[in-house]
Amino acid sequence: MKVKDFDFYLPEELIAQHPIEKRDEARLLVLDKETGEIEHKIFKDILDYLTPNDCLVLNNTRVLPARLIGAKEETGGKMEFLLLKRKEKDVWETLVKPGKRAQIGARFIFGNGELKAEVIGMGEEGSRIVKFYYEGIFEEILDQLGQMPLPPYIKEKLDDKEMYQTVYSKEEGSAAAPTAGLHFTEELLKKIEEKGVKLAFLTLHVGLGTFRPVKVEDIQEHVMHSEYYKMDKKTAEIINDTKENGGRVIAVGTTSCRTLETIGAIEGKVGEQSGWTDIFIYPGYKYKVVDALITNFHLPQSTLLMLVSALAGRDNIMNAYNVAVEKEYRFFSFGDAMFIK
């Protein structure tokens, strides 16, 4: 299969630049994966499509305000740091711009000097290994000095950092939000539980690889970046019970979906587990755990568009996307949602 098989026309004005005020009032396109039938709803109507035997699996990762603006100690030149992956307590793999100013031994200063950094090594694909120096708790300093690392297609500044976090976010470590979860409010989750639907939480820390374009023509040649995940015993039991009782395992977002399929890759059963996944799901893949998916609208030619095509069929997905464009749905991270049932 070719990457160009997953292209579609998207007018730029349909790329959502900011979240809507009420999370659960985004639009919802409901797609029947068997028939290709489409319905147009509001996100909170998701309640009508859930049954007491079902289980919603949500990713409770929390986005780090991982974008730091600082200066080179020697020259005062402005620098931008993006934290990618923690290597040790104070050592991070980091993207540094401009890279030519960030040679080994270069030192940098942030804020009023409460955070300092030194490049101690070179990482993959032009990244730098950086050691940070500070007093106190790193996360608290990052909270004061850091900015949200919004995707490159969002040009507007975010007024409230919490709008780029899910209401159930808990485990810090992501470079991007698991955006399907942004549509849930505490009130909606309560109503879902009152209906008898189980909520199960896992963690996958989203890396920047999620925004990297596919650069090969043949999708089978694409290599995914690995991301850290973990699932506890309680969540595994809820998912296995749901399967045994004939309910649906509904993944909230492609991150939950990829984690479930990684852990359940052997025989569809899941267990307590943590590790790194680079699973790449595209048409031809047979889902082992996930029965249905709540997700946003993805970029043309992206691995996430391939993942949803593997669940609902490429033709059904491409048709639904063309309908979404025609009906002026909002796309990408702050956009509207789709329920593939």
From Swiss-Prot:
Pathway: tRNA modification; tRNA-queuosine biosynthesis. GO terms for cellular component: cytoplasm. GO terms for molecular function: S-adenosylmethionine:tRNA ribosyltransferase-isomerase activity. Its main location: cytoplasm. The gene is queA. The keyword Transferase applies. Belongs to the QueA family. It catalyses: 7-aminomethyl-7-carbaguanosine(34) in tRNA + S-adenosyl-L-methionine = epoxyqueuosine(34) in tRNA + adenine + L-methionine + 2 H(+). Monomer. It comes from the Bacteria. The lineage of its organism: Bacteria, Bacillati, Bacillota, Clostridia, Eubacteriales. Signal peptide: none annotated. This is S-adenosylmethionine:tRNA ribosyltransferase-isomerase. Transmembrane segments: none annotated. It is found in: Cytoplasm. Its EC number is 2.4.99.17. Keywords: Cytoplasm, Queuosine biosynthesis, S-adenosyl-L-methionine, Transferase. It comes from Clostridium botulinum (strain Hall / ATCC 3502 / NCTC 13319 / Type A). Transfers and isomerizes the ribose moiety from AdoMet to the 7-aminomethyl group of 7-deazaguanine (preQ1-tRNA) to give epoxyqueuosine (oQ-tRNA).
